[in-house]
């Protein structure tokens, strides 16, 4: 398993492990099916990772397409869009720069597709601080750590946002 596919597996596991919490949160203002969608996204992530070749651009595109296939809901489509846009942004070269480009493109793609903005209690509120932290990094590992910290802070901040 490569570092990339290992990371994809961690995201898939986190989605599955938190599916009940997603259902609870979604049932407050929605139909409560976000946990099911999270599980379906995890299946798409794993299917894409299983076909990964080591070509970042192709692997991100494959994962996006697999998510779209397994989770054809609104949230699944947004998640897939993030990967597909990330795929379009990366190029040959530096891993840190490609990761920065990918996360920024994912944010922009999700915002455009979902017609959402910061402060609306969406995925963007976690992705934006992650992107900012990552874009300020000088090496990949510290950038990923900072991005994870930023994402957690963004998630926590949504609790105090008006619905």
Language model regions located:
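N-terminal loops that bind phosphate or other acidic moieties
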Residues: 1-163
């Amino acid at each position: 398993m490569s570092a990339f596919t290992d990371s994809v597996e961690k995201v898939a596991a986190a989605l599955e492990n938190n599916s009940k919490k997603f259902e609870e949160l979604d049932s407050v203002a929605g139909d409560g099916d976000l946990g099911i969608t999270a599980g379906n996204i995890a299946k798409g992530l794993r299917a894409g990772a299983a076909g990964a070749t080591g070509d970042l651009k192709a692997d991100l595109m494959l994962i996006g397409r697999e998510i779209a296939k397994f989770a054809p809901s609104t949230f699944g489509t947004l998640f897939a869009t993030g990967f597909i846009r990330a795929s379009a942004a990366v190029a040959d070269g530096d891993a840190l720069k490609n990761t920065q480009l990918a996360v920024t493109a994912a944010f922009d793609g999700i915002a455009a597709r979902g017609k959402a903005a910061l402060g609306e209690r969406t995925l963007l509120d976690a992705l934006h601080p992650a992107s900012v932290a990552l874009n300020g990094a000088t090496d990949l590992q510290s950038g990923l750590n900072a991005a994870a910290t930023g994402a957690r802070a963004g998630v926590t901040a949504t609790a105090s946002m008006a619905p």
